[in-house]
């Protein structure tokens, strides 16, 4: 599904990592390139980062997600809204463009970007030729940003930065 619980594992509905490695090997024999569908906009509420953020008020993952700031007048016209979850510190409001079970990641956070680079490196080193990124235009959604923020510029800059990082790992990446 699109509510990611582990970026570095094969969804059991599709098989095992051994199955994936065999797919890559068999495709390579036939000169077939494999691209992976990645979701960098959000995770599942069952993802370890989100669970740790709820359980631990000082979690390093707290700023991996977008939290509501009542002093901000958020934009409109995009997708999603803020949702509530309850953790050790009480009520936490986080943004989810698609569902309350899919909290959006804070893609402006350099630590989140470093995680994305690690994820791409993991799959590229396993033989993947490139990626298709789901929900690419929602990385910075109007509804999660202060009113008037140029979200399309933020989106473009984010993807240029990630593409440059992928090229450093694998120069001929798709």
Question: Predicted segments — roles?
Answer:
Residues 1-174:
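Active-site and adjacent substrate-binding regions of carbohydrate-active enzymes
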